Curated annotation (Swiss-Prot):
Organism listed in the record: Synechococcus sp. (strain CC9605)
Alphabetized NCBIfam families for the sequence: PRK13683.1
Source organism phylogeny: Bacteria, Bacillati, Cyanobacteriota, Cyanophyceae, Synechococcales
Name recorded for this polypeptide: UPF0367 protein Syncc9605_2376
Source organism, top-level taxon: Bacteria
Family to which the UniProt record says this protein belongs: Belongs to the UPF0367 family.
Amino acid sequence: MRIFGPTGCRSLREDDPSLLSNAVYVIELALRMSPVPVSVQRKEHSDAEALYQQIRQALENGQPRLMELTCEKVEGKKVTLLVSEVLAVQLYEKAAAAGGSKRPGFSFDS
């Protein structure tokens, strides 16, 4: 989903506070035997970090067996995962100005 700000002729800088207000934090999970990752979003960095740590602990301990995740950005989006099928989890910031940028991680595309 792309979020477009007001149009105008001013240039955007990385330290522009208007970029920070539109940022969302994506928690992305790679699943065994699935080419498509599962992702949910959080509006606050602290909430995203807490969820990341919760998933990480579940991977270490194998408990709980099932984990239900909800998305703050898309209301009503829910997914329940079998923790033993989660291979990796990553947390990254997605800013509105970076709508066409590549996802973090490794990619064979140029």
